[in-house]
């Protein structure tokens, strides 16, 4: 498995993402943008990208902060992520830069066909939903315990992607009110969506290191089921079965 570090322009900032693919696989493949949690371009993000790439996809791990800007704790992560959460236009601009870089770099290597998707975790889940709201040419967008709130709700007919969102029922970061608002938003926009909610599961449940009592915690069963659902959802989207 290769992970090519790639610097790319993101407005006035230079970002650094990673293009991940199995160079032992021949033929063109779908491309999947992966938006990591608010800790950004970590080893964990690369490992998640490799997990997705193992399904015969080309994966690009997005950098939402800029090369060399890597939070070392939750406080620094919040200081970087929260202004973007409040600014949907800037958030969309940054995730779109990663999306366009993925396509350009993968095409240069003759790796991809014309099928695209995006998967995001936590903060990254919100990133990919903003990309979908912006009308990106996506077969699918998957948000895993991600941000559902937006300052710019989807416009009627704008969302091209089929959407899958997965959450823990008692997750205080994305409470039921946010899930209900997201459902209403996407119904009004005419989007195709699915939502999976796990009882007793907190925020960041796919992260083994998550351990904040009452807020975040790893859940092995929900993680396994979410990855299986994501795998099937992407396969169905790429085969036009959704």
Sequence positions of predicted segments:
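Short alpha-helix in the alpha/beta-hydrolase fold that links the catalytic acid
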Residues: 48, 175-186
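Serine-hydrolase catalytic machinery in alpha/beta-hydrolase-like enzymes
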Residues: 5-111, 206-214
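Alpha/beta-hydrolase fold nucleophile elbow
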Residues: 108-121
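Short beta-strand/loop motif that positions the catalytic acidic residue
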Residues: 159, 165-167
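Acidic catalytic loop of the alpha/beta-hydrolase fold
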Residues: 170-174
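Gly/Ala-rich beta-loop-alpha elbow adjacent to hydrolase catalytic centers
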Residues: 120-124, 128
């Amino acid at each position: 498995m290769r992970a090519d570090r790639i610097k790319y322009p993101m407005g006035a900032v230079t970002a650094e993402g990673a293009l991940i693919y199995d160079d032992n696989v021949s033929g063109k493949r779908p491309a999947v943008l992966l938006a990591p949690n608010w800790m950004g371009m970590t080893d964990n993000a690369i490992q998640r990208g490799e997990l997705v790439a193992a399904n015969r996809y080309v994966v690009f791990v997005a950098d939402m902060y800029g090369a060399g800007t890597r939070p070392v704790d939750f406080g620094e992560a919040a200081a970087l992520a929260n202004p973007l959460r409040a600014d949907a236009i800037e958030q969309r601009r940054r995730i779109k830069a990663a999306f366009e870089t993925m396509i350009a770099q993968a095409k240069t290597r003759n790796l991809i066909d014309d099928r695209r998707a995006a998967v995001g975790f936590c903060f990254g889940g919100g990133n990919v939903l903003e990309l979908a709201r912006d009308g990106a040419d996506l077969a699918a967008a998957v948000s895993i315990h991600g941000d559902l709130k937006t300052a710019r709700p989807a416009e009627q007919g704008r969302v091209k992607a089929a959407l899958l969102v997965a959450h823990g029922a008692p997750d205080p970061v994305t409470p039921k009110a946010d899930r209900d608002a997201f459902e209403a938003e996407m119904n009004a926009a005419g989007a195709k969506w699915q939502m999976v909610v796990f009882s007793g599961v907190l925020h960041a449940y796919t992260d083994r290191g998550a351990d904040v009592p009452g807020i975040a915690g790893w859940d092995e069963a929900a993680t396994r089921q979410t990855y299986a659902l994501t795998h099937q959802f992407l396969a169905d989207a790429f085969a036009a079965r959704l």
